[in-house]
Structure formats: structure tokens, C-alpha cells
């Protein structure tokens, strides 16, 4: 860790942080997690469609949408969007165990605007949508990192 004071830069380790901060400093702890919101689906033809969940639409509250147990719709970025002709897509996960297959996650395109659209997700096993994403989704990794999640 580098610390700049009065025109001088010094190197420290993290445990030195308390002595470097002013007495009235406010520390904020960030315990957020990245949601595995990248889902890979497959058409009957075999074409793969990637759906990246951006924000919930129905229900529109994140907590309520993540707690949904049968269906919810989200605004999504759709990879390979031109190949999705409006048919029902089924989750594709070559590494899936039978629990992922049993949940029966499907995606229905309700509307599209270029590379994004409204997608209705339906599943059969009664799990919360947050659990569906944890089991079937992937962590979104920026393309410039040149690696998979």
C-alpha cells in the first residue's frame, strides 16, 4: 500500500492502516458479492444464446425478484440475439449435475431492443431465483480479462 503525505510517498502494509488514518475517519465495509447473472441457453437448433441479467422488471424490486419461486422477468443483454427467434430456450450447462437439469430453467423473450430485451425466466423446482442463478449462472467477467468465470 502506498501513502502520500506532504510530497512524500511511502510504502506500508495493510496492518499499518489505522496509524495512517485521521482519528475521525469513517471506514465503510463493502461485503457485496457479484451475482452469477450470466446464463447460457440453447435453442432446439443447437445455437447458444447468452443472457446477462441487468435489472429486474417484474417484480421490479431486487429482493423480491431474487426470492421469486416460479418466474420473474428481467432486462437482459442478449448475446447472439439474432439467433433467438422467440422460441423457448433451455438452460445449457455442459458441466451441470442433475439438480441443475431438474430445476428446468427456461427463458422466453418478451421483447427486444437491439442486443437487449425483456426475458421471462421460468423454472420448476420451487427454488428462489437467487438459488437458480447460483446453481446455473456464471460470474460476469469483463471481456478485456480474456478468461472465463
Where are these regions (language model features)?
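Terminal targeting/leader modules
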Residues: 1-2
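Short hydrophobic beta-strand that contains or immediately precedes a catalytic carboxylate
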Residues: 27-29
Amino acid at each position: 500500500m502506498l501513502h502520500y503525505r506532504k510530497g512524500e510517498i511511502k510504502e506500508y502494509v495493510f496492518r499499518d492502516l489505522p496509524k495512517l488514518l485521521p482519528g475521525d475517519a469513517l471506514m465503510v465495509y463493502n461485503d457485496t458479492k457479484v451475482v452469477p447473472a450470466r446464463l447460457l441457453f440453447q435453442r432446439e437448433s443447437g445455437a447458444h444464446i447468452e443472457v446477462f441479467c441487468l435489472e429486474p422488471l417484474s417484480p421490479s424490486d431486487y429482493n423480491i425478484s431474487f426470492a421469486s419461486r416460479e418466474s420473474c422477468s428481467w432486462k437482459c443483454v442478449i448475446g447472439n440475439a439474432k439467433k433467438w427467434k422467440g422460441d423457448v430456450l433451455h438452460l445449457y450447462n455442459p458441466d451441470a449435475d442433475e439438480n441443475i437439469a431438474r430445476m428446468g430453467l427456461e427463458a422466453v423473450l418478451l421483447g427486444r431492443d437491439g442486443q437487449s430485451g425483456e426475458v421471462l425466466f421460468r423454472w420448476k423446482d420451487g427454488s428462489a431465483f437467487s438459488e437458480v442463478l447460483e446453481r446455473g449462472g456464471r460470474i460476469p467477467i469483463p471481456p478485456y480479462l480474456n478468461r472465463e468465470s
